[in-house]
């Protein structure tokens, strides 16, 4: 299948340099960009579909790096249907699960948390709501998960893990488990700030994050309760290369502060943007 988009207006290549595309036309073949150039170089008979952008702006699809999938385009937490399809209207074409923690009666035993992650990964591998790519199946870290469990999960296609909702006595108890998950090749996101749902840690602060060294400090501007200004400074200055995930469901003042810190310390490449929706707190 060949689709040509012509007469593109302003464009953005998705980098911090904000460079425009090298042309006003794009050709996609079998779902991937195959060519970028001038509209004048295209012939109508060479492509099955030609879309005239009529000067519209073209940017890469946006990625929501923190949402909570269950199964299907539905969450029982707010009894909401079709939210992923709705997000597509805002330009989001890819979503990354921050665990299936909102599944009613979710298991917390070793076998159950692995099964839940694998089931979610498999379901969304075969299901794209309105074409949105969903990376689901984020294993919720529990104290009894071992290095062998993480290796098994990775072989089974699970590559995401979430710290913050397991039955750990203190945030520091996560440290060896997070490190074992990362050693197996999983990308670990850690809940940051105050607790959001019953049964989770009351707070995961800078000390614990720096000790854990997750790949991503999830909703680092609060989910919904933010860290202190001093902790923000520590995460930015001492926490390299931990990604700093800012969410719309968090604290706006803290998000601005973190952006200012990242800019001042040359850490803008660590900033991620996400929604953290559907939220645990409504």
Residue ranges with predicted function:
Residues 4, 61-63, 188-189, 273:
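Residue-level marker for buried hydrophobic side chains located in beta-strands
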Residues 48, 52-116:
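Metal-associated gating/positioning segment near the N- to mid-region
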Residues 8, 26, 31, 55, ...:
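Divalent metal-coordination and catalytic microenvironments
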Residues 1-45:
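N-terminal metal-binding scaffold of metallo-dependent hydrolase/deaminase domains
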Residues 65-78, 133-146, 193:
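Active-site mouth loops of central-metabolism enzymes
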Residues 83-112, 127-141, 155-168, 186-189, ...:
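Divalent metal-dependent hydrolysis catalytic cores, especially in the metallo-beta-lactamase
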Residues 158-281:
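Active-site core of metal-dependent hydrolases
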């Amino acid at each position: 299948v060949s689709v040509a988009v012509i007469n593109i207006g302003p464009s953005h290549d998705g980098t911090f340099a904000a460079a425009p595309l090298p042309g006003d036309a794009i050709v996609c073949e079998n779902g991937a960009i195959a060519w970028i150039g001038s509209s004048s170089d295209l012939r109508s008979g060479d492509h099955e579909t030609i879309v005239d952008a009529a000067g519209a702006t073209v940017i890469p699809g946006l990625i929501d790096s923190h949402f909570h999938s269950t199964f299907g385009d539905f969450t029982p937490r707010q009894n909401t249907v079709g939210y992923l399809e709705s997000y597509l209207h805002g330009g989001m074409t890819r979503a990354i699960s921050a665990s299936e923690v909102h599944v009613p009666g979710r298991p917390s035993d070793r076998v159950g948390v692995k099964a839940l992650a694998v089931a979610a990964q498999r379901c969304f591998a075969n299901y794209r709501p309105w074409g949105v790519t969903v990376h689901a199946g984020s294993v919720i870290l529990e104290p009894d998960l071992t290095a062998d469990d993480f290796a098994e999960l990775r072989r089974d296609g699970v590559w995401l893990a979430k710290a913050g909702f397991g039955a750990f006595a203190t945030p520091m108890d996560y440290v060896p488990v997070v490190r074992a998950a990362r050693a197996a090749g999983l990308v670990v996101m850690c809940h940051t700030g105050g607790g959001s749902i019953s049964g989770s840690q009351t707070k995961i602060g800078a000390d614990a994050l720096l000790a854990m060294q997750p790949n991503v400090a999830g909703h680092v501007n609060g989910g919904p309760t933010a860290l202190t200004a001093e902790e923000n400074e520590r995460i930015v200055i001492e926490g390299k290369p931990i990604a700093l995930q800012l969410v719309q469901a968090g604290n706006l003042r803290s998000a601005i502060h973190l952006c200012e810190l990242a800019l001042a310390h040359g850490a803008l490449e660590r900033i991620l943007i996400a929604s953290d929706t559907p939220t645990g707190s409504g």
